[in-house]
Amino acid sequence: VKNALIGLATAFAIALPAFAPSALAQTPAAEPPREWIDKDTGHRVVRLSDEPGSSSLYFNFNGYTPQGDKLVISTPKGLSTVDLATRKLAPLVEENGKFLFVGRKTRSAYFIVTEGETRVVKAVDIDSKKVRIVATFDRGDIQTINADETLLGGVVVSDPKIETRPDGVLKRDNRYDQAAYAANGPDGKPLPFAEAKEVRLNERLDSKIPMEMFVIDLRTGQKRVVHAATDWLNHLQFSPTDPNLLMFCHEGPWHKVDRLWLLRTDEANAKPVKIHTRTMNMEIAGHEWFSADGKTVWYDLQTPRGEDFWVAGYEIATGKRTWYHVERNAWSVHFNSSPDGKLFAGDGGDAEMVAHAPDGKWLYLMHPRGIPDVAGIHAPDSEHLIRPGVIDAERLVNMSGHDYRLEPNVNFTPDGKWLVFRSNMHGGQQVYAVELAKPASAQ
């Protein structure tokens, strides 16, 4: 069993960039440009970070202050803030650990460190830079904080004797902020990265390791289990607006699992609610996120895998669904939505990835367009059917120099005027932003 156990911590770290270790694997390179106009798109791109090894958060984690004035990023030395008005970079805290998220209520950035046998969650005040301990626990990892910053959510393997990150089975590759998913195919030859990842995910899923999802009450320090299963539980996300609504996924090959689930943490014995049910073999859904208003869960849907692409939405209160069709080149490793809910963004992908896009290495701004009924004639059951639409994709940044083993993880700034992303296009990993409006000279 041990050789089949893929480390849970490696999956968590996709979302949670480490402070210092990521710098170790960075390749020295010439100083990347601070600002330029993309010659293929006409959009302005700026570099927000100073040092290789800097990183913004995973696409569905919040890195912005509640007031929307600052972004927090990880650097080789710790955490820094970016003033979004001036782009001034300032150190926030220097401490080895893992950046978790920024609170939605207070101006606090949370990170986690290991002290002996204890996991310690700390918060640093973005203005005073004072650090405080907010929670301690023995095992597992923290993945989310709720809307009013009263609950942390995390996962843990139930049996402490199970080794979940054995050396030699799955080593981390800090250049790409995820595990080194190397594997051979049936012919003994190395598989492409995307296929090797599926093999390793499947091995971990088939191990059926008992797991628990837990919350820690930051007012009392109490830790309680909210769900237990032998499914591979991962990617916990609290709603940005409902403090007691938790989304999580069943990790593994997407065509093999029912990935998307919601769970209420304020109801005793609450059962998880499945968000999406497949209707065809090889249909996949994942890389889910909440809309900014917390009313909709959006996700990448493919019917079937690698052939037909959608940004799909599930309205939590009503169960109504919306599917926006995406053409192959615009399929993205991760999609995201703007603060006002009117636009989407995507970070593209290379030819080895699931879409096998011949020209997909771009960052995109995506304009959703609903498909109306013909001549205003409504089907009698139209209210109960999926609302269809299409995505009109606009290219923002040429990513031809980017290695997509590092996921760009696009996210909108709070004012909706920029997309922040990370990239190794100039060698070492840096944090960048692209302006959605073109400069007057480029229009």
Region spans (language model):
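Blade/loop signatures of beta-propeller domains
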Residues: 26-46, 202-214, 380-387
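Blade-terminus and WD-like Trp-Asp/Gly-His loop motifs, strongest in beta-propeller folds
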Residues: 61-70, 99-108, 143-156, 237-245, ...
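Asp-box/WD-like beta-propeller blade repeats and closely related beta-sheet repeat scaffolds
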Residues: 96-98, 112-212, 225-228
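Structural motif
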Residues: 78-80, 117-123, 161-167, 208-214, ...
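Blade-loop segments of beta-propeller domains
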Residues: 58-60, 76-122, 136-139
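Blade-level signature of beta-propeller repeat domains, shared across WD40, Kelch, NHL, RCC1
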Residues: 406-443
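Beta-strand-rich domains and repeat architectures in extracellular enzymes and scaffolds
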Residues: 26-33, 40, 44-77, 236
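Loop/turn-rich, solvent-exposed surfaces of beta-rich toroidal or solenoidal domains
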Residues: 295-310, 325-391
